[in-house]
């Protein structure tokens, strides 16, 4: 895959700036037409996209459709239904002191946007933000990950066939291309990736005070209380940890489990892995592989940080890693300080005052992107109230991202800003306050020398 030259990046950036300045993207009819074009493209290119996902990630058609294609299509359809209402000028209340004025809230597109996505959900995490950009009336440059070259190539061809470069374009390459992109002046940067790279993005954005949306990650805790339904918890956790082979930003990262139920949970977890993936998970076409050799070596390197109590099989040739439970893990080890991004699961056993110890543990670390609790719902709400995370679930994992009616985003080290549904439109928009004042009367109290100040003070 050929990297995009710096000269090409500058030319595309300048062309999109000029196109936005022309006002062509302001019309709601234009935006809806572009959303329809993107939806049509998703339908036409579905096979090429899902084939590429299989080649790059060993992601089955079913999983590719459920976790990538359908999410983007659903987002497009939502925006088609709602964008006219979101973009409509709204009247706001005007207090008597502003008489004879009318107050309005106006949505305007931020302008030219840069969208940088990772490799783990390379279709969804690139094109879902694009829906928000189109809906809000922005132009967009898309930068897919070089670690999924087949997917990135298909997306580039699809976008080139569907849109003019001056409106939406794809650039390809590694970090040198990211550097060239970040040297340009954008009106919004939408970045999905690691906190380390996000700091580079923020540093670049700060030069021009460019707003950013950062969708990051972190170590999302999975808490299993003694009141949990063990079989249901094991099934849902096993699904969440093996979905995309753990290469999900909101995958449960580590387990905090009540000592009384540890043995029962380990047994149930092993059983549910078999129910989901068969007797030999390596033969299951729905089980995704590590994205590359570097990721395989990094994740298998965590095995040395504790004692394996389930799983542990690997195959370097196919980058296969069996779901693996590990106990007796030092809290300062890489396994408990780095985002795992794989099917390895450290388990911390807690005895005594479970709720307070869990709260102390979670709040002593960076704020995670997700938080999962299994047990009595009221106890889950209490722990959620006293901790912080981007989002989460009680008695489930991952499913909060599936509801388009609630926003998705991080907090602190797990990100800033949010998107999905209206929040995607808002992410690429600026909210203006406009007052239109009549000229048929001009109340004198606001003007110097404030001769009626005494009366005005009483009114205010």
Predicted regions and their residues:
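Residue-level signal for inorganic ion chemistry
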Residues: 31, 76, 137, 168, ...
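Conserved C-terminal structural/oligomerization subdomain of aldehyde/semialdehyde dehydrogenase
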Residues: 2-3, 26-27, 321-460
């Amino acid at each position: 895959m050929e990297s995009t030259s710096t000269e090409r990046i500058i030319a595309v950036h300048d062309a999109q700036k000029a196109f936005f300045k022309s006002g062509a993207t302001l019309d709601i009819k234009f935006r809806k037409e572009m959303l329809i074009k993107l939806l049509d493209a998703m339908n036409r290119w579905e096979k090429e996209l899902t084939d590429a996902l299989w080649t790059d990630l060993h992601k089955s058609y079913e999983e590719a459709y459920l976790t990538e294609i359908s999410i983007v299509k659903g987002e497009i359809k939502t925006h088609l239904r709602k964008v006219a209402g979101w973009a409509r000028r709204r009247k706001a209340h005007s207090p008597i002191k502003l008489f004879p004025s009318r107050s309005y809230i106006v949505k305007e597109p931020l302008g030219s946007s840069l969208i940088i996505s990772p490799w783990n959900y390379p279709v969804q995490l690139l094109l879902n933000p694009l829906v928000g950009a189109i809906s809000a009336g922005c132009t967009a440059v898309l930068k897919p990950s070089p670690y999924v070259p087949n997917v990135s190539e298909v997306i580039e061809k699809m976008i080139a066939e569907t849109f003019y470069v001056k409106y939406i374009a794809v650039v390809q390459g590694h970090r040198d291309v990211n550097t060239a992109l970040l040297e340009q002046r954008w009106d919004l940067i939408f970045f999905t990736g690691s906190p380390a790279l996000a700091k580079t993005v923020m540093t670049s954005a700060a030069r021009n005070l460019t707003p950013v949306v950062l969708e990051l990650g972190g170590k999302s805790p999975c808490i299993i209380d003694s009141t949990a339904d063990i079989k249901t918890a094991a099934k849902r956790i096993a699904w969440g940890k093996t979905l995309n082979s753990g290469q999900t930003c909101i995958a449960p990262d580590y387990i905090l489990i009540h000592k009384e139920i540890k043995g029962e949970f380990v047994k149930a977890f092993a059983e549910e892995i078999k129910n989901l993936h068969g007797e030999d998970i390596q033969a299951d076409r729905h089980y995704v592989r590590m994205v590359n050799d570097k990721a395989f070596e990094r994740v298998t390197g965590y095995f040395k940080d504790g004692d394996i109590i389930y799983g542990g099989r690997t195959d370097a040739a196919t980058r296969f890693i069996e779901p693996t439970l590990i106990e007796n893990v030092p809290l300062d080890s890489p396994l408990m300080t780095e985002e795992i991004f794989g099917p390895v699961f450290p388990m911390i056993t807690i005895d005594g005052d479970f709720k307070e110890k869990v709260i102390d543990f979670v709040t002593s670390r960076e704020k995670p992107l997700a938080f999962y609790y299994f047990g009595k719902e009221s106890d889950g709400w209490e722990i959620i109230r006293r901790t912080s995370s981007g989002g989460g679930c009680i008695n489930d994992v991952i499913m909060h991202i599936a509801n388009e009616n609630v926003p998705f985003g991080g907090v602190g080290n797990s990100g800033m800003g949010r998107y999905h549904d209206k929040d995607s439109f808002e992410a690429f928009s600026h909210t203006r306050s406009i007052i239109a004042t009549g000229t048929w009367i001009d109340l004198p109290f606001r003007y110097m020398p404030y001769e009626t100040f005494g009366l005005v003070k009483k009114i205010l």
